[in-house]
A protein has these predicted regions:
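Structural recognition of the beta-strand scaffold that forms the well-ordered cores
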Residues: 52-57, 91-96, 121-127, 158-163, ...
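Bacterial N-terminal signal peptides that target proteins for export
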Residues: 1-7
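Serine-esterase "nucleophile elbow" of acetyl-processing enzymes
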Residues: 22-94, 111-117
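Cell-envelope and extracellular/periplasmic
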Residues: 22-29, 60, 94-100, 124-134, ...
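N-terminal signal peptide c-region/cleavage motif recognized by signal peptidases
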Residues: 15-17
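Catalytic His-Asp segment of secreted/periplasmic serine-dependent ester chemistry enzymes
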Residues: 165-252
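Oxyanion-hole/transition-state-stabilizing segment in secreted/luminal serine hydrolases
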Residues: 42, 54, 61-62, 88, ...
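Active-site segments of SGNH/GDSL-like serine hydrolases
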Residues: 124-130, 148-180
Length: 252
C-alpha cells in the first residue's frame, strides 16, 4: 500500500470539505455531518482506487415512479462520490425492501454482502422508520443493530448508520425520536459513524428550506431532498476517511 499513500492523501485533500460548494438549500452546519469515527476499510478501498458501497434498508430509501431508483439518494451518492474522488471507481448497489424492519434487515445482510460484487468496503444502513411504525421493542431494535453491525464488520466492511427521515406529518404519531436516540447510542458504542438524517431534515423543516408537509405529494421536493442527502452523506464518508489518514500512512 506504500506506493498508494501519496495518491490517497492527495485525493482526500482534494475531496473536501465540500459542503460549502453544495446548492444553498443543501447546506447545513458542519457539525451535523462531522463523523465521530473513521472508516478504515473505505481508506483501503480509496487507496486501491475502487470503492464499493452497499446501501441496505427499507423502501424509504428510494423514490416512487419509473425513475425512482435513478433519482433516489443511493444513485446520487454514487454520482457525488465519483465527482469528489477523481481516479476512483465508485459503485453503489442497493438491497432495499418495503416495510423491512431491523431484524429483517439483519437476516438479509449476509446474502446481500455475498451478492454484492465487488465486495463492499462500506455498508450504508438506513434504519428506524419501519421499526417506529411497527412499534418494535426498543431493546430488540438495539440488539438487532448491534448484531447487524457485527455481521458487517466480520465481512470486512465499514458501516454508516442512517436514521429515519423526519416528517412533520407523522412526528406526533410515530416515536421516531425514540428510535433515533437508540441508533445514536448503538453508533457510539460500536464506534461507527452516524448520518443524522432526522436532525438534518428537521432543521430544513424548521427553517422552511423544504416544505416537508407536501414532500410526499410533490416528487420534485422529494428528489431535491434526496439530492441533498446524497451530497451530505458523501461529505461524511470523505471526512470519516480523513480521520484514518495516519493509519493509511502506516500501511494499515
Amino acid at each position: 500500500m506504500t506506493g498508494r499513500v501519496p495518491f490517497l492523501l492527495a485525493l482526500l485533500m482534494l475531496a473536501g470539505p465540500a459542503w460549502a460548494e453544495h446548492p444553498a438549500e443543501c447546506r447545513v452546519a458542519a457539525n451535523l455531518i462531522e463523523p465521530d469515527f473513521p472508516l478504515p476499510q473505505v481508506v483501503r478501498a480509496l487507496a486501491a482506487k475502487r470503492l464499493s458501497i452497499l446501501v441496505i434498508g427499507s423502501g424509504s430509501m428510494l423514490l416512487p415512479g419509473a425513475d425512482g431508483s435513478k433519482n433516489a439518494y443511493p444513485a446520487r451518492l454514487q454520482h457525488a462520490l465519483t465527482e469528489m474522488l477523481p481516479g476512483v471507481e465508485v459503485k453503489v448497489v442497493t438491497d432495499v425492501q418495503a416495510h423491512r424492519n431491523a431484524v429483517e434487515t439483519v437476516k438479509a445482510l449476509k446474502p446481500a454482502l455475498a451478492a454484492a460484487k465487488p465486495a463492499p468496503a462500506l455498508v450504508v444502513w438506513g434504519i428506524g422508520t419501519v421499526d417506529a411504525i411497527q412499534a418494535i421493542d426498543p431493546d430488540q431494535f438495539s440488539h438487532a443493530l448491534d448484531h447487524g453491525i457485527n455481521i458487517v464488520h466480520s465481512a470486512g466492511a465499514d458501516v454508516v448508520l442512517i436514521n429515519a427521515q423526519y416528517s412533520p406529518r407523522t412526528e406526533s404519531m410515530i416515536a421516531l425520536g425514540t428510535y433515533a436516540e437508540h441508533i445514536r447510542w448503538v453508533a457510539l458504542q460500536q464506534k461507527v459513524p452516524l448520518f443524522d438524517r432526522f436532525s438534518i431534515m428537521k432543521l430544513w423543516a424548521d427553517l422552511g428550506t423544504f416544505d416537508l408537509y407536501s414532500a410526499t405529494k410533490k416528487l420534485d421536493i422529494a428528489e431535491r431532498v434526496h439530492d441533498c442527502i446524497a451530497r451530505l452523506l458523501a461529505d461524511l464518508v470523505i471526512e470519516a476517511a480523513k480521520l484514518d489518514e495516519p493509519h493509511a500512512e502506516s500501511g494499515r
